[in-house]
Amino acid sequence: MPDSSLMVVFTQVTGPREGWRQRAPKEILKRLPAAQQDIPEYDMTGLVQENLHLRSTDGGETWARFSSDTFSSAMNGYSEGSVVVLADGTLLRAGWGQSLTYCDVRPTGFLQRSTDGAKTWGSPEYLSPDTNLQTFPTRIRRLRDGRLIITGGAAPFDPDNWQWMNQLPKTHHCMWVCNDATGKLWSDPLYVTDEAEFACEEWDTAELGNGDLLAVFRAIIYDNTGKVTKQDRRQTILVQNGQAWTAGSISQTPFPHDGHPELLRTREGVILHVAPTALSWTADRGQTWTRLDCPGTGYYPHATQLEDGTILAVGHVGNDDPYGKTDQAIVLNRIRLEVR
């Protein structure tokens, strides 16, 4: 944060676990993922939903509730929790309008700003002006030269006639680049896996010393009926080419899919792959990965390294669970690297 404190944000949903539960209207349910349609416990309609911000001023030892912003949706959230601090101290986060089933927003990805340290957030700023492109931004990163990149996915769609399950096999990994320090002027999507046999919007990057990007993708393969047949993780090097990047050949990784990839370039020079199953590092642009002798993280982790070298990784217990099945507690891993 601008004041050197730490902030973590997550989605919290509360309400009755048993008894009466409201269901979303059929015209809304028909657009949503199969789980929300078929399993009432995945429908969050009628529950109290909020993005909850916790703040720490002692390096993550203790946390206090700082602020929250509420929303209402049949979905279990609308933001992957990626927030970046701009040069002027403004916070910028990404969200999905397609997940805000009860709000007057376009069904596509957008950005929001906070100029008061996450106490309040501004109106949606849509990532793409193309009303027939549905975007899924998941990560915002600041590069060493000050530029910003957003990674996620996108797919063409009819905003008046679309269904989530039909979009998934068409959604390919892409990125948006901003040369403006205010984070307002974004490029068209740069697709990096559009010729691949897999789809998804979840991927992350780590900047290499020469400006190239090491990228790790969650890769989902669908059959002709839209059924998932395989999931794993792939990787590539995005070679810097002026103000953009060109994707190299895509190869397998030694990792299971494990949800959203998370990469962290460390002060020690290695890049960490942070995941629930394990933490692994590479010093050769991803050609080899070495597993660390330490526990994995919570699901869908976010990681950062403090000035003293401590690495904090925050995730949650459980998976993409129905409401009330699992206490999806937020957990934190504290890690220090030892160079030998």
Stretches with model-predicted labels:
Residues 1-340:
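Asp-box/BNR beta-propeller blade signature and adjacent active/binding-site loops
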